[in-house]
A protein has these predicted regions:
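Charged, low-complexity intrinsically disordered regions
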Residues: 1-195
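ASCE P-loop NTPase motor core, strongest for the SF2 helicase catalytic module
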Residues: 191-267
Length: 267
């Protein structure tokens, strides 16, 4: 319905079929002739993945910021007077960066300074670094005759990164615990990442005019020819004896007959 052009079924029923289904359902609501599109697209929808098949990592930009804020409040036990407005997670789609506001406010919380953080860097800062895919490093400033120098504090860095790993593990254990959150995350993941159906080329309609009647291509050979004609970039990853030579010759001749090419080169 979008292109207003005819498409072969193997082309239409491939690609982002979830997006195509949503579009078809919108058109079918006012134009009954598109209901057949809806029916066929429903048949080829990828099987939804459940929580056991999905890994949600800190920093994934498809996770809603409010879930990160909720994670902080539940795991770090953020006091209510900070949690309401001061300490929260945000994500910028422009810069692709995560930010946690009010990182330094919750100073007297042992979960923030000991369990999931250190005296040098608290849990909110460690979480922010983890969201931005950074391993936290702690530096000391050394004063000498040549001026000030920043030197890596290996001991404090090790403690900080251990605490950061504890946050990652806590997030992994927390993220799917709530049923509503789990269902929302699974639906989001499937909509974004589990929506593509590879095209299955169908060459049954190709007649191969001029081919000697002594040669009759098998279905997989016809499909391979269709892949070459319509796919533009094709790898014939067939085993020895599958008929690749016939596929290449037939595709080359048909391509020339249709005016798609003049000189064919196979690599």
């Amino acid at each position: 319905p979008v292109t207003q052009q005819w498409e072969t079924s193997d082309e239409y029923l491939s690609g982002n079929v979830r997006e195509k289904l949503a579009t078809a359902e919108t058109f079918a609501a006012n134009h009954a002739e598109y209901q057949i599109n809806v029916d066929y697209l429903k048949r080829v929808q990828p099987k939804d993945l459940d929580a056991s098949e999905i890994e949600v990592r800190l920093g994934a930009n498809w996770v809603k910021p409010e879930y990160i804020t909720q994670f902080m409040r539940e795991v770090f036990k953020t006091p209510n007077y900070y949690a309401r407005i001061d300490i929260k997670a945000t994500y910028s789609e422009i810069s692709g960066a995560w930010n946690i506001s009010g990182k330094s406010l919750d100073r007297g919380n042992p979960l923030v300074t000991n369990t999931y953080g250190t005296m040098r860097v608290n849990a909110y800062k460690l979480l922010e670094d983890a969201l931005n895919l950074r391993d936290t490093k702690i530096y000391d400033t050394i004063h000498d005759a040549d001026g000030d120098h920043r030197v890596l504090n290996k001991q404090e860095t090790m403690l900080a990164q251990q605490a950061q790993e504890s946050i990652r593990e806590a997030f992994k254990q927390w993220i799917f615990k709530d049923l509503d959150r789990r269902e929302d995350l699974c639906a989001t993941y499937n909509r974004i990442f589990n929506a593509i159906r590879p095209r299955e080329y169908d060459g049954s309609h190709i007649r191969f005019e001029g081919m000697t009647p002594e040669i009759s291509l098998m279905p997989h050979q016809k499909n391979a020819v269709a892949h070459i004609l319509y796919g533009n970039n094709t790898l014939l990853a067939h085993c020895v004896g599958a008929g690749k030579t016939f596929q290449m010759i037939a595709a080359g001749m048909e391509s020339r007959r249709l005016g798609l090419s003049q000189k064919n080169l196979y690599v």
